[in-house]
């Protein structure tokens, strides 16, 4: 299925049904009183998270979504039927915004629902206006109009670990090696053109979800490259995994450049715990691999784990999975306590 993470859609809730003017028509009651019923309420438009959806592609086939109008009131004070609500189903992690950028809400948990356009209230029939001083009112109300809104649906993938790196750092190879995901892998930049999710199994009962996004390039925050438009997908992650190949001319400089691009997009990303995977170590001899963390330690902060790996040669992947799982677990436990 093609991946789509942003869609514009016009939503329209239903108008309220009109109230009616009617009179009782009963045998032996020549002057029956008012009996006009109220109109039904218009249907509302809701957005609901569906755990079976992973993309907004289904929404791209429509330009507008309508809920039903309410029915007019009837005789004998019958209230008109309410219009049927319209439910827009989206993947968990979807944010709904107005065209001005105002966030109406987000749906994170499966089944969570928010109202994005409320139906109009039904109008009053003449029976409502009867009083001691007005026994035969001829007044009724039209229904209130529904709402029409132009909305933007923005998907932020739900993952535990977000991969960060420049193009051709080996992120896609890593995801395919530690999970069941099958991203395109090739020896040229930008093989990842859309975000990829992979479930990583540490043990039978210990798992986490990893998200790979297109590689970032320098000055991505100025609109260059592909990665910046997908950075929203790592905003919800608990841990950031920086993938830096040892073939880089300056490992520390590459790490700082990635931090700069993240901060330019969303400063709060730098508050997340980080792990650095030094990739492509299969080009080194075994004795050189073991010394690598000590050799490059001065180029990275002391509190950031440095893990040499080779996804191609299956070196260091188990240790990477254990470290990531422990970091995710401790971070989420701390967040739960703070909440």
From Swiss-Prot:
GO cellular component terms, semicolon-separated: cytoplasm
Coiled-coil region: none
Domain (Obg): residue spans on this chain: 1-158
Binding site for GTP: 165-172, 190-194, 212-215, 279-282, 310-312
Gene Ontology MF, one: GTP binding
Region feature (Disordered): 66-86, 125-148
Residues that coordinate or bind Mg(2+): 172, 192
Top-level taxon in the UniProt lineage: Bacteria
Basic and acidic residues composition bias: residue spans: 72-86
Enzyme class: hydrolase
Comp. bias regions, Polar residues: 129-138
Keywords carried by this UniProt record: Cytoplasm, GTP-binding, Hydrolase, Magnesium, Metal-binding, Nucleotide-binding
UniProt-listed InterPro entries: G_OBG (IPR031167), GTP-bd (IPR006073), GTP-bd_Obg/CgtA (IPR014100), GTP1_OBG_dom (IPR006169), GTP1_OBG_dom_sf (IPR036726), OBG_GTPase (IPR045086), P-loop_NTPase (IPR027417)
Record's keyword annotation contains Oxidoreductase: no
Subunit structure: Monomer.
Family stated for the protein in its record: Belongs to the TRAFAC class OBG-HflX-like GTPase superfamily. OBG GTPase family.
HAMAP family reported in the protein's UniProt record: GTPase_Obg (MF_01454)
Protein name: GTPase Obg
Source organism per UniProt: Salinibacter ruber (strain DSM 13855 / M31)
């Amino acid at each position: 299925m093609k991946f789509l993470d942003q869609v514009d859609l016009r939503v329209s809730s239903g108008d309220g049904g009109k109230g009616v003017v009617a009179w009782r028509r009963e045998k032996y009651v020549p002057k029956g009183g008012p009996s006009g019923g109220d109109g039904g309420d218009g249907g509302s438009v809701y957005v609901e998270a569906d755990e079976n959806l992973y993309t907004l592609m289904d929404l791209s086939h429509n330009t507008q979504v309508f809920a039903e109008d309410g029915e007019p009131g009837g005789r004998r004070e019958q209230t008109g039927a309410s219009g049927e609500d319209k439910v827009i189903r989206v993947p968990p992690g979807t944010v709904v915004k107005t065209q001005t950028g105002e966030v109406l809400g987000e749906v994170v948990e499966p089944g969570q629902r928010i109202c994005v356009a409320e139906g109009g209230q039904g109008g009053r029939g003449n029976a409502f206006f009867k009083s001691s001083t007005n026994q035969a009112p001829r007044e009724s109300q039209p229904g209130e109009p529904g709402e029409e809104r132009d909305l933007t649906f923005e998907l932020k993938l739900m993952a535990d670990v977000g991969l960060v790196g420049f193009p051709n750092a080996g992120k896609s190879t890593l995801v395919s090696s530690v999970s069941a995901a099958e991203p395109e892998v090739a020896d040229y930049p930008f093989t990842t053109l859309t975000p990829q999710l992979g479930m990583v199994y540490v043990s039978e009962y210990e798992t986490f979800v990893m998200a790979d996004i297109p590689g970032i390039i320098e000055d991505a925050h100025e609109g260059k490259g592909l990665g910046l438009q997908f950075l929203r997908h790592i905003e919800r992650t608990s841990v950031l995994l920086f993938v830096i190949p040892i073939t880089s001319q300056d490992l520390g400089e590459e790490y700082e450049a990635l931090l700069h691009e993240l901060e330019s997009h969303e400063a709060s990303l730098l508050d997340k715990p980080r792990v650095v995977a030094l990739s492509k170590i299969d080009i080194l001899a075994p004795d050189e691999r073991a010394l690598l963390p000590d050799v490059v330690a001065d180029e990275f902060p002391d509190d950031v784990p440095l893990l040499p790996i080779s996804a191609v040669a299956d070196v260091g992947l188990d240790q990477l999975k254990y470290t990531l799982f422990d970091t995710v677990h401790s971070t989420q436990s701390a967040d739960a306590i703070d909440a």
